[in-house]
A protein has these predicted regions:
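AAA+ P-loop NTPase nucleotide-binding core of proteostasis motors
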Residues: 1-346
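A short, hydrophobic C-terminal helix/tail in secreted or cell-surface proteins
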Residues: 347-352
Length: 352
């Protein structure tokens, strides 16, 4: 327009402005390419594995590791997290290793276990730590409280209600969770409280590693570890002990006596065909005062983190730890009194 109107001075200014903008555009383009090169967002194997894990429930990022390397340190890792149950952990890890090297039936679950022993000795805690180690997250633990299945009419909730009944659309509480998370630890807590029909449903899972839900879908359990916990026999130990009028000879004899009492109660409660399908029946020992002292350090780590989160720092001396262990020790109730002791102690400190 400026050239047509013979306004050459204005046309020259437009030309100079165009050159300036062209130079500036090239400079910005070079800067953008350099920044893009430095901050390039690449989608690699790890990101793809995370997305697949989120969508499918299959822990691909853990499977990508060498299976042997992942399992080599399992026993030591679990023994550091679960105190004074080395024999139980050794049995558990050996059974899992046998299955992972290809010696098990390919349709059988990775492992089927029953954890026996007094309350508060680490049965449920070991299942949680195993879920974190094997599948990389505590969310891989499917926990079902079997006290909710004490009545006959509640048994169908495990695989889903029949057509025409309330809750048919929801699916089974066990089958639906395993269908969504095929790689998981299935924890059936306090199994002795369940109705006997529950054991009949579990027979097929323990043997063939599959179960049919109310929609007719076959749910695959071959990539799960099934753990059942029970306090069976502990009441007899509490009521009768080792005898009247004399103390126990030593701790080894106590543990052997406890195992024999628990084994007798186990055989009375569960059918032989049910027990015969388990890979291992693992008995947990009662905790000693030395074990409680070690557990104090583990429990205090969580307390330290909570205190630091609100802007303070807590230091507990060795004498205080010994005091907490002595106050929180009860051979019949395991580590649970220790948690209450720590809670009451922290409450008293807050009041002061």
């Amino acid at each position: 327009e400026a050239v047509k109107s013979q306004n050459f001075e204005l046309a020259a200014s437009y030309r100079d402005r165009e050159k300036e903008l062209s130079v500036r555009l090239e400079e910005m383009k070079v800067e953008w390419e350099a920044r893009l090169k430095d901050d390039r967002q690449t989608v690699g194997e790890e990101e793809i594995a995370n997305v697949i894990s989120m969508m499918s429930g299959v822990p691909v990022q853990r499977m990508a590791q060498a299976e042997g390397l992942k399992l080599v340190g399992m026993k030591e890792e679990l023994q550091a997290k679960v105190i004074a149950q080395d024999a139980a952990i050794e049995k558990l890890t050996k059974a899992i290793l046998r299955s992972r090297v290809g010696l098990k039936d390919p349709n059988h679950p990775i492992g089927t276990f029953m954890f026996l022993g007094p309350t508060g000795v680490g049965k449920t805690h070991l299942a949680k730590q195993l879920a974190k180690y094997m599948f990389g997250s505590a969310d891989a633990l499917i926990r079902i409280d079997m006290s909710e299945y004490m009545e006959k009419y509640t048994v169908s909730r495990m695989i889903g209600a029949a057509p025409g009944y309330v809750g048919y659309e929801e699916g089974g509480q066990l089958t639906e969770k395993v269908r969504r998370k095929p790689y998981s630890i299935v924890l059936l807590d306090e199994i002795e409280k369940a109705h006997p029909d529950v054991f009949n449903i579990l027979l097929q899972v323990l043997d063939e590693g599959r179960l049919t839900d109310n929609y007719g879908r076959t749910i695959d359990f071959k990539n799960t570890v099934i753990i059942m916990t029970s306090n069976i026999g502990t009441r007899q130990l509490k009521e009768f002990g080792r005898g009247v009028g004399f103390a126990a000879q030593n701790r080894t004899d106590d543990n052997e006596h406890s195992r024999s009492v628990i084994q007798k109660a186990l055989n009375k409660t569960f059918a032989p065909e049910f027990l015969n399908r388990l890979d291992e029946i693992i008995t947990f020992d009662q905790l000693s005062l030395e074990a409680i002292t070690k557990i104090v350090d583990i429990e205090l780590k969580g307390l330290y983190e909570r205190v630091e989160a609100i802007g303070y720092k807590l230091v507990v001396e060795d004498d205080a730890k010994t005091f907490l262990a002595s106050k929180g020790y009860d051979v019949q109730f395991g580590a649970r009194p220790l948690k209450r002791c720590l809670l009451y102690t922290s409450d008293a400190a807050d009041d002061k």
